[in-house]
């Protein structure tokens, strides 16, 4: 494939592939800087503490009826029109980053703060105005979910997190989607 390209050029092309892929995959949000501002993120529901996943907030396979936690988000920068929440299981490599357990989005109006309501897991019908599925969970087989997959380790002590991102989500053709600020919150273990 690169037979007519010098070894140095080939090495540059190959080393740039992950960067190029990052700009066009995973939602396609271009970071506005190398060091993004931090959002303030906390739980809006006292049942969520960041220690243990609350009772019943796991997947149906293990008897739960999990929903995303409601979150309070502050320090949302000007220019943001949506918040994207990427859910991950840090203990299970294939679903440990980039929204392995799904990406849920919320349209917002302006800078400042927002409360993101809880939405149900394991369904494409979120039932909350202004929310949307940015990407379904990457789980497969009996673990497959059309949206958010709640913690589903069967209680093995896996660690779950949410990466919360303030973005400008392009609304017109030719616009660029931008990542403006972000923050991780530990959901807990299950």
Segments from the language model and where they lie:
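N-terminus-centered regions that define maturation/targeting leaders and the start
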Residues: 24-190
């Amino acid at each position: 494939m690169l037979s007519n390209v010098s070894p140095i050029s080939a090495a540059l092309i190959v080393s740039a592939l992950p960067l190029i892929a990052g700009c066009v995959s995973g939602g396609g949000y271009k970071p506005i800087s190398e060091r993004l501002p931090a959002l303030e993120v906390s739980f809006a529901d006292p049942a969520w503490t960041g220690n243990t996943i609350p009772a019943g907030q796991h997947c149906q396979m293990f008897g739960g009826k999990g929903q995303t936690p409601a979150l309070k988000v502050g320090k949302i920068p000007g220019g943001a029109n949506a918040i994207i929440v990427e859910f991950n299981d840090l203990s299970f490599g294939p679903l440990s980053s980039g929204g392995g357990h799904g990406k849920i989005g919320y349209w917002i109006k302006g800078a400042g703060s927002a409360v993101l309501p809880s939405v149900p897991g394991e369904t494409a019908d979120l039932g909350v105005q202004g929310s949307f599925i940015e990407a379904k969970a990457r789980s497969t087989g009996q673990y497959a979910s059309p949206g958010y997959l709640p913690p589903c380790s069967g209680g093995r002590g896996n660690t779950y997190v949410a990466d919360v991102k303030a973005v400008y989500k392009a609304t017109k053709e030719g616009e660029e989607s931008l990542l403006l600020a972000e923050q991780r919150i530990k959901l807990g273990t299950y």
